[in-house]
Design a protein with these regions (language model features):
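Alpha-helical transmembrane segments and their immediate juxtamembrane flanks
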Residues: 15-21, 25-29, 37, 42-43, ...
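Short, Lys/Arg-enriched N-terminal segments with co-localized hydrophobic residues
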Residues: 1-11
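Aromatic-anchored segments of alpha-helical transmembrane domains
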Residues: 30-37, 84-94
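Membrane-helix interface "capping/anchor" motifs
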Residues: 69-80
Length: 126
């Protein structure tokens, strides 16, 4: 799959790459974060407790999905939203205390927001 994506990207223009890259990265990051919500499913707990915990653990994903939906059509607003979410993740999850935590949780959100803004300004310049 990765080889196909890399080969496909070789034939894309810079503008097309900047269009799809933040969207694909956002989807992959949302799926990555959703994996952490699966830790609530443990034997011996009630199903309602586990489902409630699962839905609460997915709150960051809900925010990212909302930002992605907005960014898909309104890149400037979406890019700013992603950067603000990155700042919120940094503060709320305290990723500023360890570089590895910052690089895993907050940096991808900042990067996605920056890529949305870069594409928007590249399109404006043309």
């Amino acid at each position: 799959v990765i080889i196909f994506v890399l080969e496909f990207n070789l034939y894309m223009e810079k503008e097309e790459i900047l269009f799809w890259l933040p969207r694909v990265l956002a989807i992959l990051f949302i799926v990555f974060l959703a994996l952490f919500a699966l830790d609530v499913f443990v034997p011996g707990e009630s199903i309602l407790y586990m489902i409630g915990g699962f839905l609460v653990h997915l709150i960051p994903d809900y925010l990212l999905i909302a930002a992605l939906i907005i960014a898909w059509k309104r890149e400037r607003i979406g890019g700013v939203l992603f950067i603000l979410l990155g700042l919120g993740f940094t503060i709320f999850f305290r990723t500023y205390s360890a570089l590895s935590n910052f690089l895993i949780v907050s940096f991808p959100v900042f990067l996605i927001g920056t890529l949305f803004l870069c594409h928007k300004y590249l399109v404006i310049r043309r």
